[in-house]
Design a protein with these regions (language model features):
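Catalytic cores of DNA base-excision repair glycosylases
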Residues: 3-147
């Protein structure tokens, strides 16, 4: 074990202790976004930027009723997509990012939402927080803190 690893060991131990305490305090902590698939979680999380989960959950039934998967979102009419997500704010950027992310998922990831941080971060509209939410709630991978 190198000197850097020895220095990090107490921090790693402390992090695990904090995580254990949080799990005891919040044993039933879940994602409040409504979704059925990893792509729906990704889309809902993109929509949740600068918006409440409650508002997103009002928008997603119609959105996912019309466009339930990456394939349909990738080819959706952008104006129609914008109108469906308008009430979440920043709707033009969100619609563009959702469509771009879904196109990449279809073309580069065989229509499967990636389960690795590096790949998720390549998707338009996806930063670490969104990637952490998807990894944690769609795949059970705790790669960071999600709030």
């Amino acid at each position: 074990m190198g000197s850097r690893e020895k220095k990090l060991l107490p921090l790693r131990k402390r992090s695990l202790e904090i995580l254990a305490r949080l799990k005891r305090l919040y044993p039933d902590a879940t994602c409040s976004l409504n979704y059925s698939t990893p792509v729906q979680l990704l889309v809902a999380t993109i929509l949740s930027a600068q918006c409440t989960d409650e508002r997103v959950n009002k928008v997603t039934p119609a959105l996912f009723g019309k466009f339930p998967d990456a394939e349909s979102l990738a080819i959706a009419d952008l104006v129609e997509l914008e109108s469906l997500v308008r009430s979440t704010g920043f709707y033009r950027n969100k619609a563009k990012n959702i469509q771009g992310a879904c196109r990449m998922i279809v073309t580069e990831f065989n229509s499967v939402v990636p389960n690795q941080m590096e790949q998720l971060l390549k998707l338009p509209g996806v930063a670490r927080k969104t990637a952490n939410v998807v990894l944690a709630h769609a795949y059970g991978i705790n790669a960071g803190v999600t709030v």
